[in-house]
Curated annotation (Swiss-Prot):
EC supergroup of this enzyme: hydrolase
Name the UniProt record assigns to this protein: Ribonuclease P protein component
UniProt-listed HAMAP family: RNase_P
Species lineage: Bacteria, Bacillati, Bacillota, Bacilli, Lactobacillales
Function field: RNaseP catalyzes the removal of the 5'-leader sequence from pre-tRNA to produce the mature 5'-terminus. It can also cleave other RNA substrates such as 4.5S RNA. The protein component plays an auxiliary but essential role in vivo by binding to the 5'-leader sequence and broadening the substrate specificity of the ribozyme.
GO CC terms of this entry: ribonuclease P complex
Stored NCBIfam families: rnpA (TIGR00188)
Organism the protein comes from: Pediococcus pentosaceus (strain ATCC 25745 / CCUG 21536 / LMG 10740 / 183-1w)
Catalytic activity: Endonucleolytic cleavage of RNA, removing 5'-extranucleotides from tRNA precursor
Entry's family note: Belongs to the RnpA family.
Length: 119
C-alpha cells in the first residue's frame, strides 16, 4: 500500500479518535472519520504492546495491511479509518484476520454500496 494511503502522524490519528465513531468485534476496533474532499481512503494501523514482541506485532500489522489491500477496490474512498488490533488478534491465520476485518468493516459501513459503484 502506498504511503499516500496511510495515516502516520499522531495529530491525524488523534483527529480520527476524536470523532468517537468506533465499531468493534473481539479482534479489532475500527474508528472512522468521513472526509468527502479526499480522493482516496487513508488507514492507520495500531498494534499495542500486549500483542507479543515486536516480531509478532509487525507480523500482525502485515496481515492487516494485506487484508486491507485485498479489500481496497470494495472500500469507500471518502474516509480515514484506524484499525486497532486487540490482544486476541495475536497470531491469527490470514483467513481469520480477513474474515474478522470484513465483519468489522461491514459494521462500520466501510464497503462502498453497489449504487455508488454503478455511477
Amino acid at each position: 500500500m502506498r504511503k499516500s494511503y496511510r495515516i502516520k502522524k499522531e495529530l491525524e490519528f488523534q483527529k480520527v479518535f476524536e470523532t468517537r465513531n468506533s465499531f468493534a468485534n473481539k479482534k479489532f476496533v475500527v474508528y472512522v472519520m468521513d472526509k468527502p474532499e479526499q480522493p482516496h481512503f487513508r488507514v492507520g494501523i495500531s498494534v499495542g504492546k500486549k500483542i507479543g514482541n515486536a516480531v509478532m506485532r509487525n507480523y500482525t500489522k502485515r496481515r492487516i495491511r494485506q487484508s486491507i489491500l485485498e479489500f481496497k477496490p470494495l472500500l469507500r474512498q471518502d474516509v480515514d479509518f484506524l484499525v486497532i488490533a486487540r490482544p486476541q488478534a495475536s497470531g491469527l491465520p490470514m483467513n481469520e484476520v480477513k474474515q474478522q476485518l470484513e465483519h468489522v468493516f461491514k459494521l462500520a459501513g466501510l464497503f462502498a454500496s453497489k449504487q455508488s459503484e454503478e455511477e
